[in-house]
Amino acid sequence: MPSEGSQQPSLDSFFKRKNPRVEPYSRTGNNAIIDLTDSPPNKKIKLDDEGSQKNRSMTQTSSSYFKGHPTARPLSVDKRLPRKPSAAIQAYKLQDVIPPQPSHSGLAFETCSLVPQASFVPDSQPEPSASPAPQRTTEQLKRHEEWKTRILAMSGSFRRKRSLALDEAVAAEAREAAGLEDEGTPFDGSDGDDYKSESEKNAEEVGKQLKKYVAKELAGKGKSKGKKKEEIGPSGLAYTPLEKQFMEIKEQNRDVLLLMEVGYKYKFHGEDAKTASRELGIVAFPNRNFFTASIPTHRLHIHVKKLLSLGYKVGVITQTETAALKKIGDNRNAPFARKLTHLFTAATYVEDPSLSSSSSSSSSVRFDDPVVPGTAPPPTNALVAIVEQPVDRASDDRVKVGLVCVVPGTGDITWDEFDDSQIRTELETRLAHLSPAELLLPKQRLSKATEKVLTYFAGEPKHRGRNAVRIERIDNIPEYDAAFDFLTNFYHCKEHKATVSKGDVNDERHLMTEGNKQWSLQPKLSQDGADISLDEEIYLASGVSSSKAILTLVDFPKQVVISMAVAIRYMKRFGLENAFKHTSSFVRFANRSHMLLSSNTLANLEIYQNQTDGGLYGSLIWLLDHCKTRMGKRLLREWVGRPLLDVAALKARADAIEEIMENNSYHMEKLRSLLINMPDLVRGLTRVQYGKATPNELATLLITLVRLASEFKPNMGNVFRSCLLNNIPNTLPTILDTSQRFLNALNLKQARENDVANLWADPDRFPDIQDVKDCISVCEMELNEHLMELRKILKKPTLRYITVSGIEYLVEVPIRDTKIVPAQWMKISATRTVNRYHTPKILAITKERTQHLEKLSIVAREAFIAFQSEVAEYHELVVVSKQIAVIDCLMSLAQTAAASGYCKPKFVAEPELKILAGRHPMVEMLREESYVPFDIHFSKEEGTTKIITGPNMAGKSSTVRAMALIVCMAQIGSFVPAASVTLSVHDSVQTRMGASDEIGRGKSTFMVELSETSDILQTITPRSLVVLDELGRGTSTYDGIAIAYATLSHIAEIGCNTLFVTHYPTVAQDLAREKPDKISNWHMSFDEIQMPDGGAEITFLYQLTRGLQEASFGVWCARLAGLPKPILDTAQMRSSSLKAETQERLRGIVARRVGWMLHNLFDNKTSSSQVLRNVEMLHNSLSSSSISFSQ
């Protein structure tokens, strides 16, 4: 037996290190010495709980070898002072593993070293005398070897969870995090010996495990002197790596509401979590340093749309690596790599299917929700950039406004420049038509009047029946020269075939710089940094060169050029700048081919929404919309809001509608069948233009286009009478070859699965993909060859690789066979019956294979984007798709015209409007009672101004609205609800109806009336239709009469068709008497029956009848409204009294006038003809009132 205190040669070789390294270690409140000689071979040394009796008993429980060893003793702890090392390991202190560190209690840790230290002498013990090393028996040596095997394989402090190479990488990262200097590869022999004994190798492995454990503990606690001080959050805890990721991205996107992908959820943090909780109704709770709220991944797109509709800018941070790849990667101990890959606003959200969990699995991708006839048209989600310049530098009352509107979902672009008055009615009209979801405005602020209009427009979403409008303020609005240079560079730079993918939103390599040279467009770079050559072509539909596009820009007004530069610059951040590629899609808002309906007209006539709750139900678009496709709904909304001025175009639409109603031929039925299950081709092709379509989407588009193009044979000639209907059979076959060629390039099965890597039917189309696939095949072949070797090692001829939880190429070994598993295999996972391993060779090959797979993903994505760019060059696909939308609109109008009582309007050249048996189109659909028709005729012979009087609730406002709606419907090209309509083309329909204030804009009710009237007077022409309802009622009677009289007199002189509703009989009779050839009086008829109690029973007939009617029957309407009878009686008495007083005053006026006439007659101061004229005027006054000569 060896003597006490002697050293054991086997232990010496076991713990020996040739190139010692210093590794720090620190444990709070733990002053115990780690005595490895006392450690059991099959138990784990616990360092966390120094006071645990269980841990101390574990260190005393050991195999028979350690129990029988003379130096074996329990490990004790002195909590007051650090204890001294035992004599058995005086020469083996852990000085290089655990250096002295101050504890929280102010005591120093005792240190020891695994390397012999001849000069080490404890303070309290003399240096032991040298003695020969004890000799082990054969049984002891056997037990020792068994212990070495167990300590390398079993769980515990020295458990080898991964391969040695990967463990060393982790240790290196921990040392780097601890601030230690790397001295080279640890345990690297410095003696130059290539040969190492088995015991030396085992000793090195144990040392590595111990070193890794200590380094890991050090990195976890951060108590090293060289480690950076952890940043402490508001909770008093250090920021986690995930929180640091969020803070870093949030710092760069302060105005963005961020969602971060974490596992199977998307999480909000900080103030974003509170906002999400408030807006989405989800729970937000404090978690370490931030509030946190989360949503499941499959609900992401739903919540994103909700936040966008509320006006937020939303960013989605996604994980850029999978859990399976991370487990075998070099950064497996670091957090998942994440980037801001999606950025959206309400206007720039183009239904990205990658946000939908079902998009990749669905084989019938639809680009919008199913179309339900009669539902609201899809929102335009327009983005409007606005700039202005004062007309007079001394005042900003009148300004010149430049406006550019882009609809990213469809690629439609509208521009305009116009002068606007102090009340900004022109701007308000354009906003009402365009209905933007987002406004781009200068940060320096516009004029006060403009800001007031924009703020009012964006601030009342509920009143206007739409979502909130988001306002984005833009810095550094350029001057005209800088904006023109920017646009010139934009159209000179050819879009690279493989456009940079949406990837990292914060990567602004291709964005504009704002350095010394503002608004400069940097040329795009290839992956190797070389400049991509410029190209003159800019993908215009007609294939014109960029020089011609620049000439087009020269014709644009200056403010429009500035607005366009602002819009393009903003959309580049979202990857949507390609919307401006096709200048053929540019349309001016105000042009000579369309009627301009003002915002007041849109609201008063209920064109887009009703006035009750701002909804669709009861509006004109609700009545006319029976479209089967989303693109048809959008186009019909444009038709309804912008009636035509071209008689030929109007007749073409009406003729097409008539033929659809009458023609039931085979070709017509085939035309109807085209609309069945039709996806939104325009929106889908626009996504292709942006490079944002999925393979499934693109396949659906191409299949649909091929089906459409195959319906009609080429050169069929004119199969319909209508030229609009003939456009479809004539144009569809022209895209067959192009669509079929693109479709043949795809592997449809893989496209349905969104498999970009295996998408192409011809592998040689993109050789880079095949090259990477070949490299992957080589790796897989090597793995198969290695499998043969593993079968021999494990003696399992049927051994196969398995995949568990996304981890591939696992070698599964039953627990009973683990003894034959080589020590260098890395254990990945285990169950009760099997262990799963990766061999070093598998790790190396799979790592290389993973790199190739990542490269394949990048190359395949670039190839698919290049293919989308190639498809987008054929703009005729979009043109044909828009023709399908035209057919859908005509079919919808034909369905409306099929209702009974509709007629085809007749257009004439001379100014005229004649309506026979006209009806209100929406009222007759909403009410069960039949609508009482009306007749009206405007012409030079019949007069152009009709004054309408009559009782309240008699139908005056409904009748004049019906007349205006009939004109609008006729100039849309639709049939109209009347027996017969003959009209000339009206260039505008102007209305001023109702009474409401605009407190938000600082306008009273009367001020609103006058502002709207002023706008009408400035814009009407002899070919306008004007509707004025009770002008002047917002002020005193005398002022109201004066304003109504003067306004109507002025309009009558212009000669436009006018409907003037009033309760001022004086105005009506005076103007009708003064201008009988232009102005005539009409009223809504009624029956009045006297009741026995002295009251009257009124029956409204709702018929438009010639003549003036003074009675308004306001008390009767109050009775219908349910006012109490005492109030009604008092009101009736007061009304009678006021009427008597008025008649008395009139009799006095008549008496004085008669006296004056007689006096002049007897004095011969007045000619007989003048006397006759005075008598006639007096007679008219008396006949129009209730005063008689007898009174």
Swiss-Prot record:
Whether DNA repair counts among this entry's keywords is yes
What does the entry list as the binding residues for ATP? G950, P951, N952, M953, A954, G955, K956, S957
Which coarse location class describes where this protein primarily resides? nucleus
From which residue to which does any coiled coil extend? none
Question: What are its GO biological-process terms?
Answer: mismatch repair; mitotic recombination
Please name the Pfam families in this protein's record. MutS_I (PF01624), MutS_II (PF05188), MutS_III (PF05192), MutS_IV (PF05190), MutS_V (PF00488)
Task: Return the protein name.
Answer: DNA mismatch repair protein MSH3
What is the species of this protein?
Answer: Cryptococcus neoformans var. neoformans serotype D (strain JEC21 / ATCC MYA-565) (Filobasidiella neoformans)
